[in-house]
Amino acid sequence: MSVLVDIQHVSKKYKEAPRAAVSDLSLIINKGDIFGLLGPNGAGKTTFISMLCGLFPTTSGEIYINGHTHKTHSKESKQAIGVVPQEIALYPKLTAWENLMFLGHMYGLKGQSLKDNIKYNLSVLGLEANMHQKIISYSGGMKRRVNLIAGLLHNPQLLILDEPTVGVDVQSKQAIIEHLKKLNKENGMTILYTSHHLDEAEDFCTHIAIIDEGKLVTQGQTEALIRENNCNSIQEVYLKITGNQFRDK
């Protein structure tokens, strides 16, 4: 398999913090993986993906994307990453269509291909009939779906999703997960997915890494982790390895 993301002994320590937010974390994400980074709230998931996106530097360790170091990887490598943040990054007084067209132009996209891309994703995610309504009128689940489309506009090689199904209704959650599975299967899109919902991630992810208090607990292919630990679920794997019930801090 071809390596897309190579994380080597990465740590992040904030000033005044009693412990490192991320401590000596190493993992590999191959092209085509649906990789779940799982852990309770406060485990270090958001800090990790913020470093991966280049929002701030590591305290120590190296991040490689397509073989380029985090410090020197090219503009093209940076553009290969799409991010869907946990916060809704949309303008409430613009329509879904206006939001997505504006964001597309910020990426340097234009023309009929941009319009077709937006229409396709809105249709697949069940939002075509509402695309000319202002975001302020959307439900939380609808906003999450538009947020996802924003991260897909430039057809990224790696799509990073930070808790994409938090606080959404069942219909929106199912629509998001099914669309992501389709993108992975048909386009080979690599997905990095953070969550503290182990059951959901077990069904969705091909590979899983569990972190807690900034440290790696275990990682591997989802089915192999369950089988090799003689467990029936990732929840049981976590309990067996740590001795603790998975908790939402």
Give short role names for the model-derived ranges.
Residues 159-163:
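Catalytic Walker B motif of ABC-type/P-loop ATPase nucleotide-binding domains
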Residues 155:
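Conserved catalytic motifs of ABC-family nucleotide-binding domains
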Residues 174-186:
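Helical segment within the ABC ATPase nucleotide-binding domain
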Residues 219-220:
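ABC ATPase "signature
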Residues 101, 105, 112-130:
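Conserved ABC ATPase "signature" region
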